[in-house]
């Protein structure tokens, strides 16, 4: 076979060949970065975050970044973090661009495709991390390289931090953001942070909403436990540990924490109302007012999504008890997972749990470090810039400030005094993040890349 035919045949066998389209050299460079990241396994079990960080560091150095401005810092051989800097003219505090390199577990037998081979198929990129969070990681590295090649000098330094163990959060002593704050804070000190947590929503192919996250709920689990002397099951007693715990959990199941609105949730309901009609739209406008309407709150609380925006929530997620089929239980234990509003002290949450489940004999113990994460102020200048770029790229799409009901590494930065915002311009339909066959739309990925580059340049030249 002639050499030209050999090359053509190899290209046809490439995982990207089936759906690949003609791309500009810049788009191809970005795709190479993205593919390299996705195809490096960065799961906690067998992956290597340091390998991914070093691969990105090599690309930045090859693009002309001095070694002093590109560092891989690792508290563990496989938990490396990349910190890179494009130096500006010094007019303002740096802008930190944050993404995490680690991904959740993915077993080949659970997927219809190889999770660690980037596949382009039917208008989507498939692979673990394609949406969470290697899309933003690749975009930030690509953006720094593009700006460097353009000779762009920002008014303030641009810092890219690609970190480890976001998915494990507070349970990991190697969480990259927490470790960098504790050990290398000057390298990431910034006046503003752009991170995951926002992003767009597609509905029926329409770009419906671009979200700007300014705050997020704090996750904290509690262990509820009852211990007992037990005994033989042929002689039941009234102080059965399982019954006592079950009674407390039943009381919790009927309890709602009080509504606590903040700046982000008020604006969320005010703007989301425009996407609805009838009673739902009226109720959203009514709860956005000060004070919110009680009847409207009650109706919206029946929806699990809106309820999560309105109050702290605590729900039983695990249950165990007893040690033998013919013995009275000596122990009954449950895990209650709480998602705590950013302005709601964790001490108050625990006191409320004690009151609701009934106190003794049920003990309640936090399973992690109690943590109060503040909100970031809703920056009107940032909001205006996001609105302008969104309107240019997707006319008719509204920007909605929001509070995340999950958790990202922004919580550690907000607590450290870094105003942090979740915004990406990545519009996701069924992304399947954390699930089987994770994917992102090809066009949506490239549009998000363009959105973030425009936003970065905008913010880099801001006074």
Can you say where each PLM-predicted feature lies in the sequence?
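Bacterial N-terminal signal peptides that target proteins for export
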Residues: 1-6
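N-terminal signal peptide c-region/cleavage motif recognized by signal peptidases
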Residues: 14-17
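Acidic/His- and Gly-rich active-site-bordering loop/insert found
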Residues: 21-128, 137, 147-156, 336
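Acidic/histidine-rich, surface-exposed loop or edge segments in extracytoplasmic proteins
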Residues: 31-42, 225-228, 365-372
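An extended, acidic, His-containing surface patch that forms the Zn2+-binding/catalytic region
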Residues: 90-92, 201-203, 260-323, 330-331, ...
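Acidic/histidine-rich catalytic neighborhood of metal-dependent amide-processing enzymes
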Residues: 124-125, 131-211
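A short core secondary-structure module
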Residues: 175, 179-182, 234-258
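Short amphipathic alpha-helices in soluble, non-transmembrane regions
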Residues: 239, 349-357
